[in-house]
């Protein structure tokens, strides 16, 4: 069965991969993709510039792809 504790295998793999990211990347990715915040909103929450948030999302996505490739 592909359902494990309410998550399908793809969701569980993504959740585990997110846990391997540095906090700075994990936080912005979570706020943007799971909570739906814009880069501007995240910037205000974390006291960063919108461009810094954009860079962290970009780098975090790249690192996440590498982690998922390894699995």
Report residues per predicted region.
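A short pre-motif secondary-structure segment
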Residues: 28-32
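The N-cap/first-turn positions of alpha helices
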Residues: 24-25
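Acidic, proline/glycine-rich intrinsically disordered inter-domain spacer in sigma factors
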Residues: 1-19
